[in-house]
């Protein structure tokens, strides 16, 4: 098995992390959970917990700068040049507070308004929306996306300048999207497409054919698929819940394509309740399990209702039960999830287990 340099920089969803809990990353430059986009703080390999690095620069710009320094490896300061690297750059924006974005990115949309840019029919521009989100809410979000796109482009340009682009697999994805007012929702932690359907792009010149694929790819599939693409498929642990889809990405047959994706949202301290669901090629099903209340069902037909504005569950319970039996239950069993689509008694001895 080849030895890799393993750096991570940017947002790591945690506070200061002791070295023994850094999952083997040998170059550590962590943003933590602090949404201070214009004045971010970082912990490096040796930065003490009570004295983080304080940077006066928009975080995606700074993280692109650091990624470029790592790639250049001037003076051998950042990595062993004789070994391959697996660089993780995790930019926090686009993320609230949305007004923490440099003016130059906002200026690119100076002739537009949030309302002119967001014309989705499932957004209601009423008084509640205007007061709750603010007139520049969507425009600021788009400015952040534009800025992140530019900084990511700088990293790609540097790979090309260093002549590393042909031998480097680049993966771009997000952990979630934001509803931006769609169906009355501000951001994430909901089942709607705007929050759940995220970009997923792979680039490896000469190795991966150019294509688009409607494969129902999920977050747990990233790790085994990357190992498969690196030729390390035989080293994927049996405990990994995801699937190696490297054959599909390389244009080869052989991967069993999933018929659904698994959706889960569990409140803190309550593994056995909360929301579970599946997203098939056509339908989105979500079931909400609350203590002392009947189950709540949501079913969207994404073909006939792409903006998910109508809940058709109550008129299609046979389809709901079919999706539960054929899709949801297998996912629950596969992932070891104790949640089941049954009601929780209000006087349960311990409803949180």
Q: Language-model features: where?
A:
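Segments surrounding the PLD/"HKD" phosphodiesterase catalytic module and close analogs
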Residues: 313
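Active-site-proximal cap/lid insertion segments
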Residues: 32-61, 68-220, 228-239, 287-294, ...
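Generic structural marker for isolated residues within well-ordered, non-membrane alpha-helices
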Residues: 223, 309, 328
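Short amphipathic alpha-helical coiled-coil/interface segments
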Residues: 323-328, 332
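Short histidine/acidic/glycine/proline-rich micro-motifs that form metal-
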Residues: 2-3, 93-95, 268-269
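His/Cys-centered metal/cofactor-coordination and adjacent catalytic loops
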Residues: 1-9
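Catalytic-site signature of metal-activated, phosphate-bearing donor transferases
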Residues: 2-3, 53, 242
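C-terminal cap/loop subdomain of S1 sulfatases and analogous C-terminal strand-loop tails that border
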Residues: 9-16, 23-32, 176-182, 208, ...
């Amino acid at each position: 098995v080849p030895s890799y340099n393993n750096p991570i920089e940017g947002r790591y969803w945690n506070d200061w992390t002791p070295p023994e809990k850094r999952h083997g990353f040998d170059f550590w430059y962590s943003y933590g959970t602090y949404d201070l986009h214009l004045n971010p703080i970082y912990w490096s390999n040796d930065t003490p917990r009570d004295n983080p690095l304080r940077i006066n620069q928009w975080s995606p710009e700074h993280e692109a700068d650091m990624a470029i320094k790592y790639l250049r490896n001037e003076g051998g300061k950042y990595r062993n040049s004789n070994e391959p690297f697996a660089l993780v750059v995790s930019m926090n924006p686009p993320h609230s507070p949305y007004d923490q974005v440099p003016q130059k990115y906002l200026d690119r949309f100076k002739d537009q308004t949030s309302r002119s840019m967001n014309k989705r029919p499932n957004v209601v521009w009423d008084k509640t929306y205007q007061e709750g989100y603010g007139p520049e809410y969507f425009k600021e979000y788009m400015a952040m996306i534009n800025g992140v796109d530019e900084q990511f482009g700088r990293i790609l340009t540097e790979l090309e300048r260093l002549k590393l682009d042909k031998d480097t697999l680049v993966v771009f994805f997000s952990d979630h999207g934001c509803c931006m007012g769609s169906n009355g929702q501000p951001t994430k932690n909901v089942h709607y497409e705007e929050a759940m359907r995220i970009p997923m792009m792979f680039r490896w010149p000469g190795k991966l054919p150019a294509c688009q694929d409607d494969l129902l790819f999920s977050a747990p599939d990233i790790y085994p698929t990357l190992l498969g693409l690196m030729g390390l498929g035989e080293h994927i642990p049996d405990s990994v819940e995801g699937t190696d889809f490297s054959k599909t990405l390389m244009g080869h047959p052989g991967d069993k394509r999933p018929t659904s994706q698994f959706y889960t949202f569990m409140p803190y301290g309550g593994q056995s309740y909360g929301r579970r669901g599946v997203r098939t090629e056509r339908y989105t099903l979500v079931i909400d399990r609350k203590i002392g209340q009947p189950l709540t069902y949501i079913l969207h037909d994404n073909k006939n209702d792409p903006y998910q504005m109508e809940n058709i569950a109550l008129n299609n319970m046979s389809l709901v039960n079919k999706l539960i039996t054929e899709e949801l239950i297998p996912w629950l069993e596969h992932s070891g999830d104790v949640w089941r689509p049954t009601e929780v008694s209000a006087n349960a001895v311990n409803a949180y287990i």
